[in-house]
Amino acid sequence: MKAVLLVVAALFLAGSQARHFWQQDDPKTSWDVVKEFANKYVDAVKESGKGYVEQLDASSLGQQLNLRLSDNWDTLSTILTKLQADFGLATQEFWDTLEKETEWLKQIVSEDLQDVKHKVQPYLENFQKKVQEEVEHYREKVRPLGIELRDGARQKLQELQEKLTPLGEDLRDRTREHVDVLRTQLAPFSEEMRQRLAKRLEELKDSATLADYHAKASEHLKMLGEKAKPALEDLRQGLLPVLENLKASILSSIDQASKQLAAQ
C-alpha cells in the first residue's frame, strides 16, 4: 500500500507532464495547487464563520444571553491566520522533501509518458486528418444545397432539411468508424503503459528506497505536528474567552430563570 501511495505521489508531482500532456503553458506546481486550495478554504471558513457569529449575536437567544461573540471574532481570525501561516510553512517543507525524494520516480514515469506519447502521436494525427477530410467532404455536399436554399427561399426549406438529414447521419457514422479504429489502434499502448507502471511498482517494492522514504515521511509528519502545536495552542487560548463568556451568560440566564420561578 505504501508503494502505491508513493507511485501516486510521484504521478501527482509529475502532473505538470501528465495533466498538461498536450499543452505548452507552464502549469502550477503541486505545492501551489495545495496552497491555493488551503488558503481559499481557510478564507471561506473565516468569512462564513464571521457571518454566523453576527447572526447568532443578533438573534433573540444571543441578545438574551448577551453573547457578544463578534467582540472576540477579530482576535480569533488573527489567530487562525497565524495558524494558517505556521502550518503552511511546515507543510511546504514536508512537500518539498517529498518532491525531492520522488524526483527519480517522477523522471522515470515522465520518460515513459513521453515514449508512449511519441508512439501514439502518428495515430492521433491520422485520426485528426481523417475527421477533417470527412468534415470537408460534408461541406462540399452541403454547399450546393445552401445555394439552392437561397434561390428557392422558404418553400424549399423542408426539402433542404430532408436532404441534409442523411448527409449528417453519414458524417456521424463515418466519424464513429474513425473513432473505433483509433480506439483499436491505441489499445496496445494503453496496455503497454499499464505494464510499465506495474513494472515500476515492482521495482519500487524490491528497492530499499521505499523503507527509507517511509521512515523519512514519518519523521517529517512528526515534525509537522510539533510545529503546528504552538499555533493550535494559540487558537485554544483565543477560544477560552469566548467559551468563558458563553458559559457565564448561560449560567446567568439560568440563575435569573430560577429566581423568577422562586418568586412565583
From Swiss-Prot:
Gene3D superfamilies, per database record: 1.20.5.20, 6.10.140.380, Apolipoprotein
GO cellular component: chylomicron; endocytic vesicle; extracellular vesicle; low-density lipoprotein particle; spherical high-density lipoprotein particle; very-low-density lipoprotein particle
Assigned keywords, A-Z: Cholesterol metabolism, Glycoprotein, HDL, Lipid metabolism, Lipid transport, Lipoprotein, Oxidation, Palmitate, Phosphoprotein, Repeat, Secreted, Signal, Steroid metabolism, Sterol metabolism, Transport
Sequence repeat boundaries on the chain: 67-88, 89-110, 111-121, 122-143, 144-165, 166-187, 188-207, 208-229, 230-240, 241-264
Compartment annotation: Secreted
Residues bearing the modification Methionine sulfoxide: 193
One Gene Ontology MF term: chemorepellent activity
PTM characteristics: Glycosylated.
Main location: secreted
GO biological process terms held by the UniProt record: adrenal gland development; amyloid-beta formation; blood vessel endothelial cell migration; cellular response to lipoprotein particle stimulus; cholesterol biosynthetic process; cholesterol efflux; cholesterol homeostasis; cholesterol import
Signal peptide as annotated in the record: 1-18
Subunit organization: Homodimer. Interacts with APOA1BP and CLU. Component of a sperm activating protein complex (SPAP), consisting of APOA1, an immunoglobulin heavy chain, an immunoglobulin light chain and albumin. Interacts with NDRG1. Interacts with SCGB3A2. Interacts with NAXE and YJEFN3.
Protein name stated in the entry: Apolipoprotein A-I
